[in-house]
Design a protein with these regions (language model features):
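N-terminal Rossmann-like or analogous alpha/beta NTP/dinucleotide-binding catalytic cores
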Residues: 1-48, 205
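Structured secondary-structure scaffolds
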Residues: 23, 28-32, 36, 79-233
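Short, flexible segments with low predicted structural confidence
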Residues: 11-12, 74-75, 177
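Low-complexity, flexible helical/coil segments
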Residues: 9-14, 55, 192-200
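Cys/His-rich short segments
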Residues: 44-100, 104
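Short secondary-structure junction motifs
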Residues: 18, 51, 212-214
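N-terminal, helix-rich and Lys/Arg-enriched segments in bacterial and organellar proteins
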Residues: 7, 16, 40, 73, ...
Length: 233
């Protein structure tokens, strides 16, 4: 509540306005996330297994071995320099590997989908290196949106958070005025550190759920302070 109010206060000081302010704790969002989960599961794109690997709490992201380095005896993510921990737990997975070719085909058919060109090349290179199925639930904490029909699992934050683009437009009510007017989105303007989530994972979720993709994803750089990013996104 405190952090949410801080954003509202800052917007007022900067004389910024918005037509809606959505929080992922709202019932309309929870309803949309669980509906999307059920659609993905119904289509065979979610299954239960076990996850073993590196996870960064601060980045809220999973990392492969080639994305990790050791500095002063501690394991960190190469891209963000955030500490990572080794976890082993039961998890639901999204069949991301299934969507490797459809994603590459989509990028080729829609060359302006990712901008600038350097970001597009990063994404295509990452996808071509081979996509592994993505862990989309956690058991080690209780806060978050519960997996439908399994109270022991909480939905992974990025599947949850990305869905706010749809819940703000009252999805799955596709005939709703807001959804018809604003989806597909003209552009997702995001920081380069969350490009993978918006240009790979999010499009794969949407393709699997048979939902139109946004028209463009633009990954901008960071404002630096002492050669480190000031903003998370």
């Amino acid at each position: 509540d405190q952090i949410s109010q801080t954003f509202k206060d800052l917007s007022e000081k900067l004389n910024l306005s918005n037509t809606d302010f959505i929080r992922t704790t709202e019932q309309r969002h929870i309803k949309t996330v669980q509906y999307l989960w059920n659609e993905l599961e119904k289509n065979g794109d979610i299954y239960l297994s076990n996850y073993t690997g590196w996870y960064s709490v601060s980045d809220e992201a999973f990392y492969n071995n080639n994305e990790i380095e050791e500095v002063d005896g501690k394991k960190i993510a190469i891209s963000s320099k955030s500490s990572v921990e080794w976890i082993e737990e039961e998890s639901y997975f999204f069949r991301l590997s299934k969507w490797e070719k459809p994603l590459l085909d989509f990028y080729e058919s829609n060359p302006s989908f990712i901008s600038p060109e350097s970001r597009k090349n990063e994404v295509i290179s990452f996808v071509k290196s081979g996509l592994k199925d993505l862990s989309v639930s956690r058991k080690t904490f209780s806060w978050g949106i519960q997996v439908p029909n399994n109270k022991n699992h909480v939905i992974y934050v990025w599947l949850d958070a990305l869905t706010n683009y749809l819940s703000a437009l009252n999805y799955p009510e596709t005939k709703d005025r807001l959804f018809k007017k604003f989806w597909p989105a003209s552009i997702h303007l995001i920081g380069k550190d969350i490009l993978r989530f918006h240009a790979i994972y999010w499009p794969a979720f949407l393709l699997a759920a048979k939902i139109d993709l946004p028209k463009k994803v633009y990954g901008h750089g960071w404002i630096l302070s002492g050669e480190e990013k000031m903003s998370k996104s």
